[in-house]
Amino acid sequence: MPPPFVVTLTTSAQNNLRDQLKEKNFIFSQPQNTVFQARSNTVTCTLYPSGKLVIQGKGSEEFIEFFLEPEILHTFTHARVEQDLRPRLGVDESGKGDFFGPLCIAAVYASNAEILKKLYENKVQDSKNLKDTKIASLARIIRSLCVCDVIILYPEKYNELYGKFQNLNTLLAWAHATVINNLAPKPAGDVFAISDQFAASEYTLLKALQKKETDITLIQKPRAEQDVVVAAASILARDAFVQSIQKLEEQYQVQLPKGAGFNVKAAGREIAKQRGKELLAKISKTHFKTFDEICSGK
């Protein structure tokens, strides 16, 4: 794990940091002798009354390079990522942990070094580091450069498939294998595919690819979104998720908060009360514990 990163912020930078971390859905608390502590799955930011900011966590280097320096400190001193210019395919998903809305799976095929250089030049990175407006603009660039495929499983279809597979990782493997198969060159040659290892066993996704008779080398690893092509796929998946949520909100005239926290459960209760459980089932992932709790009045 990288060592802690320490920097002193001005008052305006502190306020800017707090606002932007809230937009990124960091979880806030206030341990003793701090102004605040904000956490994501990979980064912890602790701000002290002196203005000292301490950043820790396995995702701290990427957080500093792609967010803190350009957006808060307005510097660019952190080490650059070495460019990997090998043609490859990346795949990622969005919406897996969101109660409302679809599961979106995207694949991106960067077929040559020039395309890859442009992805690096445009600072393509893990969508979790980006605001939704930045995601939308990068998604347009990625679609103009790369061959792309996106599957959007709206809740009704998602729930149907979950009923068939009875396991989220098996469903994810089927969806990942589908977009990989759709984009993989035939024959694949030296082109390979990269995916996050979302299941305990690498065999879960490999088995799904074998069923489709997809002949391509597959690399599965934790935090695969550090790779620029997987990051591009994460951006397309997130962009599709955000647009799909908006579409559902317009179609059913409801507000659908992202995530699976207290505000999401409160919104679900209100929808079930005002519009019925049948509508709730059309716009949410019904295997979530949240759905049963809402329907049982907990």
From Swiss-Prot:
One of its GO terms (molecular function) is magnesium ion binding. SUPFAM superfamilies: Ribonuclease H-like. It comes from the Bacteria. Its EC number is 3.1.26.4. One of its GO terms (biological process) is DNA replication, removal of RNA primer. InterPro entries: RNase_HII/HIII, RNase_HII/HIII_dom, RNase_HIII, RNase_HIII_N, RNaseH-like_sf, RNaseH_sf, TBP_dom_sf. One of its GO terms (cellular component) is cytoplasm. Manganese or magnesium. Binds 1 divalent metal ion per monomer in the absence of substrate. May bind a second metal ion after substrate binding. Transmembrane segments: none annotated. Keywords: Cytoplasm, Endonuclease, Hydrolase, Magnesium, Metal-binding, Nuclease. The keyword Cytoplasm applies. Its cofactor is Mn(2+); Mg(2+). It is found in: Cytoplasm. It catalyses: Endonucleolytic cleavage to 5'-phosphomonoester. Residues 86-298 form the RNase H type-2 domain. Belongs to the RNase HII family. RnhC subfamily. Endonuclease that specifically degrades the RNA of RNA-DNA hybrids. This is Ribonuclease HIII. It comes from Chlamydia pneumoniae.
